Amino acid sequence: MAEISESSIPRRTGNHHGNVWDDDLIHSLNSPYGAPAYYELLQKLIQEIKHLLLTEMEMDDGDHDLIKRLQIVDTLECLGIDRHFEHEIQTAALDYVYRWWNEKGIGEGSRDSFSKDLNATALGFRALRLHRYNVSSGVLKNFKDENGKFFCNFTGEEGRGDKQVRSMLSLLRASEISFPGEKVMEEAKAFTREYLNQVLAGHGDVTDVDQSLLREVKYALEFPWHCSVPRWEARSFLEIYGHNHSWLKSNINQKMLKLAKLDFNILQCKHHKEIQFITRWWRDSGISQLNFYRKRHVEYYSWVVMCIFEPEFSESRIAFAKTAILCTVLDDLYDTHATLHEIKIMTEGVRRWDLSLTDDLPDYIKIAFQFFFNTVNELIVEIVKRQGRDMTTIVKDCWKRYIESYLQEAEWIATGHIPTFNEYIKNGMASSGMCILNLNPLLLLDKLLPDNILEQIHSPSKILDLLELTGRIADDLKDFEDEKERGEMASSLQCYMKENPESTVENALNHIKGILNRSLEEFNWEFMKQDSVPMCCKKFTFNIGRGLQFIYKYRDGLYISDKEVKDQIFKILVHQVPMEE
């Protein structure tokens, strides 16, 4: 089929680059790790490690025992294999550590005592909070001196080098899972980031730090908690631990690393099949022949697989990728390829859910809307089958909210109107697309979601508001210059500066970054608080939010697929992890 171009009517342009992925490359992906023998080896390793975990954790009570348990939990999580050991992690590690926990942190010798080991306390606090145990950040105040600096409580040469850096790294990672109003966490984060940056620069008060530990420090500084997605973290730590020869002297560490590599490769084989399916679906849909829409199906699938990689969530990943593609087609159409008159007709078509309203529009719009209606209706059929009840209204209403927000933006652009900051944010949260990107996959998870659960995770709900808000701000912070060039004058930055004409761009950026940071703390709370929402649902929403921060860290990774983005995708989707014989 020949590619279809736009009509001669003058229209704005998005200046999007084309598809950077060769379909032949995607369809050539082939891994031997789908063979049953590898799955059998995986199960054998899991059982061996479970036995070793019980052996490793059957030690005399004391600080070393507590740290050992916490280090094992941290390693399993960093390598992305903790799901195989959920029972052991809770009963043999976290429940045990919590029995020693008090208002000052981990007990030493008895529960009522106080351990002066910052590394143990920070590791324990982070692990317990992430697993929703009730722990207070106030324990970290015990490690501040009279000058407000955090200390490790080592003496002499013992305090130089690895132990001190390890303690500060643990404190940094603990400080990142803060809740609103926890001042000590803000202080700890600022202090440790400055300290560890000095270490990386070769300055400060420590010398001769282990290179593998420095790699961990570099990763933590480059990819904080909200910018670190599970698959990228696992892939990175496979390399970090793989080069740590002293760490590999332990038998259990060797087996954990081997399991993590095998697990990654087996899962990657499944992910190959999914991205190949999405690529065929995209090619066969006909929409791929419209040469002015962004072709980002590989990037969208990579986004979701970096966040939600487990084998049981295949349908949700595919639904997410399809939904993201629909959002992009609509985004490009409303932003740059349709007139305001056409946009109003398209919006009315979605309001009434009547495709015939677009009959008199250009062919490229009709093709796009046929693709949109067909895909949404197909997803609704899958959702109804999974949930066992009619979900048509909730899905369509979510799409209508999304489309209405685009119409509002188009009207602002057409009239040159710059809304108030609050008006922009409210509409921008809807136009982020996170509502529908979150809803479709959630409804295809292996969970029945009754109305009382949906009310807590769908619009209007606090966790969805925060997903939309943090996504919108992260997008704006990276895109405002590009969008200004395309004529999209309304962004959170410009709206804020219009209301505050005395503000500089730097001040406006700092204000908006402050909103983002506070919102991420609230996001932490909504994710980790105890409620009736299935954890897989909250985890999906939270990790998609982390994925957005990852994507927008250095660039708009969905708008610009540069070499670094391609390299990341190759490491996750294309290249296998080398296995030692």
UniProtKB/Swiss-Prot annotation:
GO annotation, biological process: diterpenoid biosynthetic process
Domain of life: Eukaryota
Cofactor: Mg(2+); K(+)
Binding site for Mg(2+) 3: 475, 483
Annotated residues for binding of Mg(2+) 1: 331, 335
SUPFAM superfamilies, per the entry: Terpenoid cyclases/Protein prenyltransferases (SSF48239), Terpenoid synthases (SSF48576)
GO MF: magnesium ion binding; terpene synthase activity
Reactions it catalyzes: (2E,6E)-farnesyl diphosphate = (1E,4E)-germacrene B + diphosphate; (2E,6E)-farnesyl diphosphate = (+)-delta-selinene + diphosphate; (2E,6E)-farnesyl diphosphate = (+)-guaia-6,9-diene + diphosphate
Main location (coarse class): cytoplasm
Family: Belongs to the terpene synthase family. Tpsd subfamily.
Additional record remark: In sesquiterpene synthases utilizing farnesyl diphosphate as substrate, magnesium is more efficient as cofactor than is manganese.
Record function comment: Involved in defensive oleoresin formation in conifers in response to insect attack or other injury. Involved in 34 sesquiterpene (C15) olefins biosynthesis.
Protein name per Swiss-Prot or TrEMBL: Delta-selinene synthase
Organism: Abies grandis (Grand fir)
